[in-house]
Amino acid sequence: MDNRIVVVAGPTASGKTRLGIELAQALGGEIVSADSMQIYRRMDLGTAKATKEERAAAVHHMLDVADPAESWSVARYVEEASRCCDDIIARGRLPIVVGGTGLYIDSLISGLDFADNTSDNTLRDKLGAEYDSLGGEATLARLAQFDPERAAKL
């Protein structure tokens, strides 16, 4: 990904979308959302997702790209957002990354490579089966053997 991008970051409902749109209009840019909840379709409440009017005022990317049941990760975000940014730059426009998910933003702008990152659910599946067979109390007692502080919080 080319390094020419603008980033607008901050908490939910702090005016990032409005500023991003103004920058896109003034600088010939397109918005790339960096919000871990706005990627999901039908997750509009509580996410301050850009409205139809705001989307009409500037091109938006990385909104409504996944179903809520879909597995999503920072690695996948970086892969798809990088592709968006590269495409925007190839068309002579400026990517404007707008959002509040710091991990997404940091990973995108630092160019982290997740190519060798694979998900292995073996341990998760094993522990889930253990929980199902032993029950919550026994599983908590086992956790206390390895991490008493964490077990005490549960």
Positions of the model-derived regions?
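Phosphate/pyrophosphate-binding catalytic cores of soluble transferases and nucleic-acid-acting enzymes
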Residues: M1-L154
